[in-house]
Amino acid sequence: GPSAPRRVFISNAMLPMASEVHTLLVPIYGDSSGLSASRIGLILGSFATATFMVRLLTPWISRRLNEHQVLTVALFIAGAVYLAFPFLRNAGTLMFLSFVLGIGLGAGQPMVMAILHTHAPPGRMGEAAGVRMSLVNSMAVAVPLLFGVVGGTFGLAPVLWSVGVCLTTGGWLTRRANAGPSP
């Protein structure tokens, strides 16, 4: 399988992707669901609130779970939210899902940096951080373009489900990699 730094880079690409898709598609999805702009803003705000709150709890969380466990849970939470999103249209429910997504992504992103720091070859942390930033910035450009085309062609549900499957698969791979080699 992929080396530890490569797995970290893959996970690192998934988390910003999930955040970008949320920011891009919630307004479109909310509008197509008949929600007002203020309700859509509340949905986006619930995501930001959860992200902020969980970041305040990061020291407490990291004393109880290791980075790989937090990242695994974050990917599974985010994947489950994206898989459920297309089935729901109520503003309150979407606010709740966005809040849960904010918890997952907010907890996972700092752990990626901790894992990257742990697995970067000695003396190459700057290089690893540079590759990470290049990847994150590339995702910020590519994801809206790609999913905009897919969503415009096939609708929003396949985009949301695809993101959910990617994140859930990432959680499974992260959990499997953290479990070590099979006997």
Placement of each model-derived feature along the sequence:
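Structural signature of the two symmetry-related core transmembrane helices
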Residues: 69-84
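Transmembrane alpha-helical segments of major facilitator superfamily
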Residues: 42-51, 136
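Intracellular juxtamembrane helix-capping segments at the cytosolic ends
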Residues: 107-120
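Helix-to-loop junctions at the C-terminal end of transmembrane segments
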Residues: 54-66, 151-152
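Helix-loop boundary and gating motifs at the non-cytosolic
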Residues: 4-11, 15-33
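Loop-to-transmembrane helix entry/capping segments in MFS-fold secondary transporters
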Residues: 37-38, 122-132
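Paired small-residue
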Residues: 81, 92-100
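A membrane-interface helix-boundary motif in multi-pass transporters
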Residues: 149-166
